[in-house]
Each structure stands twice: as C-alpha cells, then as structure tokens.
Amino acid sequence: VIAGRIANRLNLGGTNCTVDAACASSLSAMKMAISDLLEYRADMMIAGGVDADNSPMMYMCFSKTPAFTSGENPRPFDQDSGGVMIGEGLGMVVLKRLEDAQRDGDRVYALIKGIGASSDGKFKSIYAPRSSGQAKALKRAYEDANVEPLSIGLLEAHGTGTDAGDLAEFEGLKEIFNSDKAKNSDYPNYQHIALGSIKSQIGH
C-alpha cells in the first residue's frame, strides 16, 4: 500500500500503483504516468523509483551474485569493469502536460518528447539481456518523440557494468546507430555521440 499511502497523505485522486519491472521499474512507472496525462485521465502525476534493501538477507543474497562488482568504482562499457553496484535511494518526478505547467507558472526542468519500452521475451534466462529488445525500446522511443536518432549528441545508458549487460546494450545501440541510414547520414553528430551512465555511478 505504499503508493496508496502517498496518495492518501498528499490527497491525490488519480491512479496509484506500485510497478515492479526490476531495473526498468521507474521507466515503466513514468510510461504509465505519461499515458494518463496524454489521455487526460489526470492533470498531474508523480512517478519514480525506490530501492531499499532493508534486510541483511538481501545483502547476503546479492553478495553471492557474480554480476556484482567487488570494487568501489563501476566502469560500464570498460574492459576493466567488474560488474554492477547496488545503491539505495529514491527519485521522483512531478509530471504535467507542458501547456498546463506553463499556465500554472511551474518551473520546467525537462521536456519528455517520447518514451518507449519493450521486453526481451523468452531468452537464455530471465536475467540475460537481449540486444534486440534493447533496440526495440530505443526505436519506439525515437519514433514516439519524432526524433531522428542520429540528431542526438549524448546518450544516457543503463550501463550495468557486466559483460552480458554492457554487450547487449551496446549491440542494441549499434543496431539503431550503425544502420545503412546512419552510414549515409548528413547529421553532424553521426561520428560523435557521447555515451554515459549516471545510473551506474549512483547504483542500480
């Protein structure tokens, strides 16, 4: 009842629910919130993610997982990367339609032009990422935003820092940015798109 408790305390009358999609939970929650806004089922939505491993047993279980780094500095997409680092915390955003935010005099920090999601389906295991699924989510996001992928100059990645995760994500990026269309592109950023992962520095 966590989401319901927040709605109760803040006197919010829209949809409230908890979304569990592992590493994609906050993005999935945002996608649901955006849908409610665009379809005028709500005028404001609060969405985000939280991770709090409040049990010693959780830390013990995670410590046995080979995907987790033994060091302090995760290095996604680096040959010296040792794996993923877990972090605890909470991040939330308040979402409104742009015209409503401007009308209300709100401070607008960012504009979401589009969003995309996908699932890997049946693959090697439920924990193994699939590059085609990554590419599908990217493609849907760019199409939803009506943005040409090659026009961007910075890409924020998931960046787990694991061999399997980084490889699948990078292969998905190559599928989008290294197509025949990309090779014939006139966009100035085609040869240089910065790749970062703030999430890996905070913790997954």
Model-assigned labels for residue ranges:
Residues 1-204:
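Condensing-enzyme catalytic core of the thiolase-fold
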